[in-house]
Amino acid sequence: LENTRKAHLLDGIAVTKFMYWLKKNVGKIPMDEVSVSDYLQSLREQMEGYRDISFDTIAGYNANAAMMHYKAEPDTAAKLEPQGMLLVDSGGHYDTGTTDITRTFVLGPISDIQKKHFTMVVKSNLNLANVKFLYGCSGISLDVICREPIWKENLDYQCGTGHGVGYLLNVHEGPNSFRWQYRPGFDNPFEAG
């Protein structure tokens, strides 16, 4: 666990530097989904013990952020402006472990519906972060707790809430997952290990 914490600390430094750079420069210098992805990777490469990205970075601007596993291409990458949202799903392999994080950056004015949806996601994350669960609790239970603020609005998202992360292996490491649909063999109880 200590190594995993170290990996996330290193990765968090790179992501924080990226966030500062993005907020300071959006609308002032040309940037698109590919260039911001490349810049974030360059920051990770400066971290001690960095090995490689843990998966291809997903950087989706505005409508592109809603497409699961979107892949920006140099010739079609959306240009970033000082408005709307940028979703970045990314991670790195470090000597101390593997990371996978998703962050949404508000780059400027957004609509009321975007504010409402963003707030529902924050509430969902807080639900999950604050839950106290007993030994043997499964991903299904945690997923439902996380989705509750979104379900209250008769909305949903089609992907799982979470997944196992390998240690310098596959970033989507089975069989553990957080999803509300039951899949035999893919929902092990959570145990300290």
Regions found by a protein language model. Give the residues of each.
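Active-site neighborhoods and metal-handling regions in enzymes and metal-associated proteins
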Residues: 1-193
